[in-house]
Amino acid sequence: MGYILLKLLIIYIFIFSFLQADKPILVKNNCASVITVGVLTNGISSSFPELSFDLTPSASNSFSKPDSWGGRVWARYHCSGSAGKDAQNCGVPGAVNPASLAEFFFKGTGGKDFYDISLVDGYNMPLSISPSGGSKPDGYECGSPICSLSSCPPEYAVTDATGSVVSCMSACSKTGSPQDCCTGNYNTPETCKQNAQAADVKQRCPDAYSFAYDDQKSTYSCEANGYTITFC
């Protein structure tokens, strides 16, 4: 009897470990310059990413996260080495220093992963997300969102000390108004509508979130084994 119980325990541990296995995320740099990749888990308040690494052109690197992880991944130019200590230009993306985001929420409703490209705060470079090991792609089911948007209207441009454009604000990041940010009296899908800037971004980058309530045309789901994020 003891032998049988031991075998059952081993099987249980194996199955539990398999179900809780970490999920790999591969990041590729298709840009012409070095990029610095940042990773931050949802719920962590920090000025800097919890994980950061540089990628030279054509290089790639991978990291793994628990099967229940939720967080975001981004990349920036000119943030390697000591430059990365500049929180304003190289820290966690926000209204004043936006970046194109790859967002993930593993093991959500129905056991599926949910992922998207978010330009809600703004953007700074093209990117795409591709699942691996899931079912055959069908629209938002195991699809591969892509956004090649890179140009920025002058009125939304964020520039560095030399005047070079480093990222592009959204209308919400620029004005902070409840109407543009879907807050206050505009915090529901019924009251918050796409502003002109968000509509322009959505037209040029239809796979991505352009404002807070863009869920129906921006959220992808899949039971995947891992993901690849490609910048540029």
Model-derived features: positions:
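Extracellular low-complexity, O-glycosylation-prone Ser/Thr/Pro/Gly-rich "stalks"
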Residues: 2-232
